[in-house]
Amino acid sequence: MASKPEKRVASSVFITLAPPRRDVAVAEEVRQAVCEARRGRPWEAPAPMKTPEAGLAGRPSPWTTPGRAAATVPAAPMQLFNGGCPPPPPVLDGEDVLPDLDLLPPPPPPPPVLLPSEEEAPAPMGASLIADLEQLHLSPPPPPPQAPAEGPSVQPGPLRPMEEELPPPPAEPVEKGASTDICAFCHKTVSPRELAVEAMKRQYHAQCFTCRTCRRQLAGQSFYQKDGRPLCEPCYQDTLERCGKCGEVVRDHIIRALGQAFHPSCFTCVTCARCIGDESFALGSQNEVYCLDDFYRKFAPVCSICENPIIPRDGKDAFKIECMGRNFHENCYRCEDCRILLSVEPTDQGCYPLNNHLFCKPCHVKRSAAGCC
């Protein structure tokens, strides 16, 4: 071969043949350009070079997995018989170096900056896009980072016992028009359609509200109550006490004395006929009722000295002293000679009578010695 490079036409492209050293330099320049392009756009695949084996590289090999390009090992440069080297691969211009953009899939979108909302989940990557990236020897981009869902924190609630208090059973509905009133006599329900009588804070059937003695109907009539039992007027009067003097029924005020009942107008003094009422009274020998004044005037003893009745004075009790068959006031029981008060006890200060006269002991001795009363 001559030192001057020769020009040949292949596939309508001008190819300049260069020595092997220049081939290494050109390959190194192409590799650096591809690396710089990859640094600038990491998501784009490196542009494949158009070589005679390009048409075969695009076809899948029967021994490789579909969807993944088979890796080819470049063959060693074939040596010629004249000791030279085969011509270097043709140098492609800028238009041939770049791949056909129509044949490549669109580049994947850059990872989103904003995090997806909780409601919108990220859409899964299409299977066709992943297959295309695998053919270009590129790994699919990692899925965008997802923020942990900030849902409401679930905390274990307090344990509840297995047996809970059951709610009270619902009250049975009362039938409309039904009555809950009970007759106090027959203990049966009083229907709203029946005649009823309300008395003594109770409910009665009209036919059940009768006198408990003579069974007389009392509905609409006056009645009396005794021990919680309704009575008609005649039966009620029969239960009342009668006056011990006139024998009539005591209806209003009553005075009880001597085990009997009296009208106030019938309980009077037998001497002056004055109503005694709630005053003290005295009884005669035949249980006659006397006021105190008439009783003392009639039955009180009379003092043998002052000849006045011995009766209480000014609310004070009066005591009578009996001696020799005579009655004396305490103040009138004295010695007839020296007028000293005599004692009722049998002592030296007591009474020493002589011929129906009252003497003390010294006067009694003196009268007895003189032989006169």
Swiss-Prot record:
The keyword Cytoplasm applies. Residues 104-114 have a biased composition (Pro residues). GO terms for biological process: cell-cell adhesion; regulation of cell shape; regulation of integrin activation. Signal peptide: none annotated. Residues 276-373 are annotated as: FERMT2-binding. Its main location: other. The N-terminal region is intrinsically disordered. Serves as an anchoring site for cell-ECM adhesion proteins and filamin-containing actin filaments. Is implicated in cell shape modulation (spreading) and motility. May participate in the regulation of filamin-mediated cross-linking and stabilization of actin filaments. May also regulate the assembly of filamin-containing signaling complexes that control actin assembly. Promotes dissociation of FLNA from ITGB3 and ITGB7. Promotes activation of integrins and regulates integrin-mediated cell-cell adhesion. This is Filamin-binding LIM protein 1. It comes from Homo sapiens (Human). The lineage of its organism: Eukaryota, Metazoa, Chordata, Craniata, Vertebrata.
